[in-house]
A protein has these predicted regions:
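Catalytic alpha/beta core domains of metabolic enzymes, predominantly
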Residues: 123, 138-141, 146-318
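Conserved, mostly hydrophobic/aromatic
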Residues: 24, 81, 135, 179, ...
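Short, acidic/polar
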Residues: 32-44, 84-90, 162, 218-227
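Conserved beta-strand positions in the central sheet of alpha/beta enzyme cores
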Residues: 54, 100, 134, 178, ...
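Nucleotide-binding motor/catalytic cores of P-loop/tubulin-like NTPases across gene-expression machines
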Residues: 322-338
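Active-site beta->alpha loop and helix N-cap motifs at the rims of alpha/beta catalytic domains
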Residues: 46, 50-165, 169-170, 186
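Short, well-ordered coil/turn segments that N-cap beta-strands
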Residues: 18-22, 49-51, 74-78, 95-97, ...
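N-terminal amphipathic alpha-helix/helix-capping segment at the start of soluble metabolic enzymes
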Residues: 1-27, 127-128, 271, 304
Length: 338
């Protein structure tokens, strides 16, 4: 396995990048303001030894819940997902170790302000509270300006968005950041991260195949991407995104560590013949954005109902939220959005 060349950044008590161990993380799938359910979810992920736990915050009730939860889990390393409301950054920053923002979401809110002004608002909150930042680019919610500019190359649209945001943070004197470029197709994840790392080899990368779906298919998609990237020295922290019941979310950590161990020891698993040529069911891993958790059952039902079509080149997307749901279903032959 080729050694990584990225700089080290600090997320609370954790370091990633450079020669630091590759961190394995997951995300709470419950609505944050549901304290009982979210407490249970954090306990599940801590029991699985998650290095970082990501929690989404969308409104003031979530912020109040986050404040209570932090008192219960003072030692946990937490990342917060700002969703579509970047203005929550200074309110949540005192309770977390990393802030994740999606460049595509900044386009829609407060259009009278420039993207740079919005990014600077987040950066200032991170600086004042000693937080790291993740620039999280997702194929389902790329900034429309980049989608239009690179309409013939969706991977380049993601890469250019990420590189430009890195430049903004650099110009603002902020270096404690990492980047993610996620797609539901393994090949595009590989391509995007390779392109980015060639241009910015110094920036730590968070790897993941978004909406990978149900196991075992979702595990195979993730393994394909991770094997190609990590063996080449690309990747500093990982997330395995699987569509699972909340109490089983610890499996994401277990699977992630198994994949890392296999790569480190030179064991590359064979992929089933024609795996990427037939039916492709995309399903999100659930998070606090989901308003109807029945979508996990729906994804399982869809797989059973479509067994007859497994040889056909079709994509069915089963989404659970308003954030990536619309974008991910755009390119699917059939989209189901709870």
């Amino acid at each position: 396995m080729i050694s990584r060349k990225t700089r080290k950044i600090r997320i609370g008590k954790l370091e990633i990048g450079g020669d630091s161990p590759i961190a394995v993380q997951s995300m709470a799938a419950t609505q944050t303001q549901n304290l009982e359910a979210t407490t249970r979810q954090i306990e599940v992920l801590e029991a699985a030894h998650a290095d970082v736990i990501r929690i989404a915050v969308d409104n003031e009730k979530d912020v109040q819940a986050l404040r209570v939860l932090r008192k219960q889990f003072p030692e946990s390393v937490w990342s917060v997902d700002l969703q579509e409301n970047y203005r929550l950054a200074p309110i949540v920053a005192p309770f977390v170790d990393k802030i994740r923002y999606n460049p595509g979401h900044l386009f829609h809110l407060e259009k009278e302000k420039t993207i740079r002004e919005k990014v600077e608002f987040i950066v200032n909150a991170a600086k004042e509270n000693d937080c790291a930042i993740r620039i999280g680019v997702n194929c389902g919610s790329v900034d429309p300006d980049y989608k239009e500019r690179y309409k013939d190359d969706s991977v380049e649209a993601m890469v250019r968005s990420a590189v430009d945001h890195c430049q903004m943070l650099d110009e603002m004197g902020f270096e404690n950041y990492c980047v993610s470029l996620k797609d539901s197709e393994s090949e595009k994840v590989i391509d995007a991260n390779r392109r980015f790392s060639q241009e910015r080899p110094d920036v730590p990368l968070h790897l993941g195949v978004t909406e990978a779906g149900l196991p075992p298919e979702g595990i195979i998609k993730t393994r394909i991407a991770f094997e190609q990237l990590i063996s080449a020295g690309i990747g500093d922290t990982i997330r395995v995104s699987l569509t699972l019941p909340n109490d089983d979310k610890g499996q994401e950590i277990k699977v992630g560590r198994e994949i890392l161990k296999d790569i480190e020891e030179g064991r590359f698993r064979s992929v089933p013949e024609n795996f990427l040529e037939g039916l492709n069911i995309i399903a999100c891993p659930s998070c606090s954005r989901v308003e109807n958790d029945k979508f996990v059952d729906l994804a399982q039902d869809v797989r059973k109902m479509t067994e007859y079509a497994e040889k056909y080149k079709l994509t069915i997307a089963v989404m659970g939220c308003r954030v990536n749901g619309p974008g991910e279903t755009d390119d699917a032959d059939l989209g189901l959005w709870c």
